[in-house]
């Protein structure tokens, strides 16, 4: 997931020992850890957690996902992939200081930072620029990389950019749609999901229905003989040399 480094399997033993000391366990083993309820793990923070990327190098995940795509060993199948406009909302959970990343570039790669700024005209301040750069490096870039990988296998790819914010949440989500905000729209369950069901306007479920239809049409129509998904706005698949994108911008 993302373009963040995966967690090397050889480091997991150190994590296991630290977790055993944290709970505490008399014997530091995977078997003893599995006996602990799952709810005890989700709230763990560094250095006890392994997020946001998974462990790699074992039977479950032998190599990093991106390596598989670069080597062309992924399944040959249509893909839908995209990102949200404020994916940087989750960077603090990842342990990333978005303003600090820009400050580091200024110290170590001043010329490179100058080039990066050309890609974001009008964006002022380290935090604002860091939000844009970290979002694109960790999330937006991944969609482009996967698109190219599937095209090399002769498979179509549909990319999206999700920027819809519920009408009652504009003051909360000042920079756009947060990481994961698209899920309730994809599954069209705004009227059932908390807390959005408490304040969803008439326009919000209407938009969610359109989003869900695109996803359903992808499941029904996507294939090597399909170049466009039907919907309120026809959604063409990306073509070699043409990186098409379905936007939703408020």
Predicted regions and their residues:
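Fold-level recognition of mixed alpha/beta catalytic cores in primary-metabolism enzymes, strongest
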Residues: 1-21
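Stable alpha-helical elements in mature extracytoplasmic
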Residues: 12, 16-19, 29, 142, ...
